[in-house]
């Protein structure tokens, strides 16, 4: 089967800045894939190349087998991209905007049933005849997602789709996107809400300084890189030097330690007993994708 996305040895220079350093990535049809990384890692540059907005300095990218540079129209026809920015045409209502967007890709009145499904799925049905300028910020975000889906592309890129939106919209959006994925659409997600990626995505790629530093299933990443977390309520105390290196975070007298093996629990408790520090409460938690992220790319 032809991959949904094939990225082969992509480099991108902006003057003297080497923004992408030999990215190799294959995303299969039907995947729900997360692309994660701190600001400046190169995610937006990679998405811009995928969308045909900028050209790579070296390497090639294809969408469903079509090269994004040499076969731009065919590749773009198969791709829907939800941008971070709220960019919209202020002169049309929501339905008009979606019909125009679909028309750019050769879709006519036969596409109206799909437009209705999008409007219903994203909670925009009662706003179909409302001018885009009059929508709230959250509704504009929904409309932008609908716009990316208007021509029914098989591959959908969601670039921070839930940034700055309320919980209700986030849940509605993910229910609709999960349905699209079940129906066969390939979903690529970038997000700073790591719990979303952990819950939704079957595979994760993590970027740092223009390179992919981890690429695996979510479960494998958790098993390989994440440590357990020991949370101790100690009050306002000074930790013994012996265990300071294991400290992940400290807030209001609660100290969180990263453990690479269970034997370290006794190491921590022994050091506290020796220092006459009383443990008020103790919890042992499983690691999550945020722990993997911090371990691999740092707290940037």
Question: Where are each of the predicted segments found?
Answer:
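Conserved ABC transporter NBD signature motif
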Residues: 59-67, 74-75
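Conserved catalytic motifs of ABC-family nucleotide-binding domains
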Residues: 152
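Conserved ABC ATPase "signature" region
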Residues: 99, 103-127
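Short, charged/small-residue-rich alpha-helical element at the C-terminal edge
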Residues: 227-300
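Catalytic Walker B motif of ABC-type/P-loop ATPase nucleotide-binding domains
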Residues: 156-160
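ABC transporter nucleotide-binding domain
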Residues: 174-259
């Amino acid at each position: 089967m032809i991959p949904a996305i094939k990225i082969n040895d992509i480099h991108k220079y902006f003057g003297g800045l080497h923004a992408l350093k030999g990215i190799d990535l294959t995303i299969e049809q039907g995947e729900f894939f997360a692309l994660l990384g701190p600001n400046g890692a190169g995610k937006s540059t990679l998405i811009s190349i995928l969308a045909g907005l900028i050209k790579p300095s070296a390497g090639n990218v294809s969408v469903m087998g079509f090269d994004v540079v040499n076969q731009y129209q065919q590749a773009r026809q198969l791709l829907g991209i939800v941008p971070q920015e709220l960019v919209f045409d202020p002169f049309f209502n929501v339905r008009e905007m979606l019909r125009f967007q679909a028309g750019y890709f050769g879709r006519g009145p036969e596409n109206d049933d799909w437009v209705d499904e999008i409007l219903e799925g994203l909670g925009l049905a009662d706003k179909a005849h409302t001018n885009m300028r009059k929508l709230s910020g959250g509704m504009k975000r929904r409309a932008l997602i609908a716009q990316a889906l208007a021509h029914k592309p098989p591959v959908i890129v969601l670039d921070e789709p839930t940034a700055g939106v309320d919980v209700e919209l986030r849940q509605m959006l993910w229910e609709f996107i999960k349905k699209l994925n079940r129906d066969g659409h390939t979903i690529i997600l970038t997000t700073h809400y790591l719990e979303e990626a952990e819950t939704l995505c079957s595979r994760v790629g993590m970027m740092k300084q223009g390179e992919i530093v981890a690429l695996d299933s979510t479960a494998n990443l958790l098993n390989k890189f994440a440590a357990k977390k020991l949370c101790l309520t100690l009050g306002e105390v000074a930790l013994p030097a012996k265990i300071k290196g294991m400290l992940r975070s400290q807030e209001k007298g609660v100290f969180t330690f990263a453990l690479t093996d269970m034997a370290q629990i006794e190491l921590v408790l022994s050091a506290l007993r020796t220092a006459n520090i009383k443990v008020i409460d103790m919890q042992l938690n499983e690691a999550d994708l945020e722990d993997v992220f911090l371990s691999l790319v740092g707290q940037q």
